[in-house]
């Protein structure tokens, strides 16, 4: 079974068990006598706290998360979903309590203003930190370094949520199993937050490099970095997070880029397209600039090992994780198909390299696809070379619309979802 399904199923199982534990906590007959608004508030608060905590674990970049979700890309997608649902649930937790108090003619202040019991105040602080973060993220355009600092508010929110759970008189405090279950996930979220903030670079591997060769070809920067000390050890198709340290003209943001190769001189090669504000500032790099590299990440090499006839489809700069991967697959005797789609021939940076491989290896089927003259590449074009697409494993990397469209077409041609691996880097 595809490991990303394991991760998704685990999330669903955790929510299911949490719901059962909450219901079992009311097995004494209190369920029937519990106000429906109070029951809803309890459900939203407990499930929301668990999902919110899990979102920290999913964004920690821990190795087990990468393998459990078939790569950090899928883990981050689930992180965004669990975080969003958890946030909505947590925000509506006090809303239902306020509504209940209003209907009963009771005071609503204790749910909105931290002036009542300290256990309630902890919960209010947690919500305030969450709301502040949402306002800063959605309505105020902040520089990246400031935006990143504001995300410590999430840690503060989690901390106060834990204090709220530990001190509030509720089913969580009265039922030991439910209490330990919820507290475990809150603590796990806290540990993940601390790990991501202080430990992950040390555990994963951090390396100091300097800029050696730098050139621009059209909209693409070709960058070769050389180690200042220990060098990174990576497998084909992997990527790393780069951060420029000492050039004030380049943002100190940390971004993931595919490792094209590690050359014979020990230099690590990247090809980066000028897409957003950050990548455009890379044009200010100069020889000798210091660059921090964290990694490597990525599991393409593990997927490659399991499939004897891989099909690679790359769009534009999406070719970068496949350059060394294709050569590795050919050297190991696999029959390899590569479709390299670019708008015009000048964008095909690695065309000559692949042509040389096609001359060298009879087990290599290579096709350069010029979309400006032939239109976008689709499953029907690939099917002209491969009759039964359903028996192949596909690696796809490129612009998201291209990947989504191709996946849909391949699925319509009978290719299983588990046999399509899409590499993307939406990791913020």
List PLM regions with ranges.
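Alpha-helical transmembrane segments of multi-pass membrane proteins
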Residues: 14-29, 56-58, 93-96
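Ferredoxin-reductase
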Residues: 203-290, 308, 342-344, 355, ...
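Membrane-interface interhelical loops and short amphipathic "cap" helices
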Residues: 27-39, 104-111
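Canonical alpha-helical transmembrane segment with a positive-inside/aromatic-interface signature
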Residues: 177-184, 194-216
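Alpha-helical transmembrane segments with an aromatic anchor "belt"
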Residues: 68-82
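Membrane-helix interface/capping segments
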Residues: 57-72
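FNR/FR-type flavoprotein reductase catalytic core
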Residues: 7-11, 15, 45, 49-52, ...
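Functionally critical transmembrane alpha-helices in membrane proteins and complexes, commonly lining
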Residues: 36, 40-56
């Amino acid at each position: 079974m595809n490991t990303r399904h394991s991760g998704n199923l685990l999330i669903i199982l955790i929510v299911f068990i949490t719901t059962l534990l909450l219901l079992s906590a009311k097995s004494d007959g209190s369920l029937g006598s519990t106000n429906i608004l109070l029951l809803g508030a309890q459900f939203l608060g407990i499930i929301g706290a668990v999902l919110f905590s899990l979102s920290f674990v999913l964004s920690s970049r821990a190795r087990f998360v990468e393998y459990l979700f078939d790569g950090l890309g899928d883990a981050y997608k689930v992180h965004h979903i669990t975080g969003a649902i958890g946030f909505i649930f947590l925000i509506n937790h006090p809303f239902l309590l306020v509504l209940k108090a209003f209907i009963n003619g009771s005071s609503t202040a204790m749910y909105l203003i931290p002036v009542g019991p300290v256990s309630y105040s902890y919960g209010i602080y947690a919500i305030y930190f969450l709301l502040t973060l949402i306002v800063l993220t959605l309505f105020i355009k902040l520089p990246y370094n400031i935006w990143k600092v504001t995300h410590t508010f999430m840690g503060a929110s989690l901390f106060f949520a834990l204090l709220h759970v530990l001190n509030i008189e509720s089913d969580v405090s009265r039922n030991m199993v439910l209490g330990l279950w919820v507290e475990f996930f809150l603590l796990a979220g806290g540990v993940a937050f601390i790990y991501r903030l202080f430990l992950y670079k040390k555990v994963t591997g951090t390396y100091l490099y300097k800029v050696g060769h730098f050139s621009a070809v059209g909209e693409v920067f070709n960058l070769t970095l050389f180690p200042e000390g220990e060098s990174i050890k990576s497998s084909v198709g992997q990527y790393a997070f780069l951060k420029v340290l000492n050039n004030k003209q380049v943002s100190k943001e940390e971004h993931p880029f595919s490792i094209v190769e590690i050359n014979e001189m020990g230099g690590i090669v990247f090809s980066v397209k000028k897409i957003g504000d950050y990548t455009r500032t890379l044009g200010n790099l100069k020889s000798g600039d210091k660059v921090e590299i964290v990694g490597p990440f990525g599991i393409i090499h593990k997927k490659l090992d399991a499939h004897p006839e891989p099909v690679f489809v790359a769009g534009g700069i999406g070719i970068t994780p496949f350059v060394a991967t294709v050569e590795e697959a050919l050297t190991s005797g696999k029959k390899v198909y590569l479709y390299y789609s670019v708008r015009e021939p000048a964008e095909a940076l690695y065309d000559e390299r692949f042509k040389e491989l096609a001359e060298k290896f009879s087990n290599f089927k290579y096709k350069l696809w010029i979309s400006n003259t032939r239109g976008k590449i689709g499953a029907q074009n690939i099917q002209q070379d491969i009759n039964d697409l359903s028996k192949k494993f596909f690696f796809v990397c490129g612009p998201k619309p291209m990947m989504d469209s191709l996946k849909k077409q391949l699925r319509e041609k009978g290719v299983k979802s588990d046999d399509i691996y899409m590499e993307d880097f939406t990791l913020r």
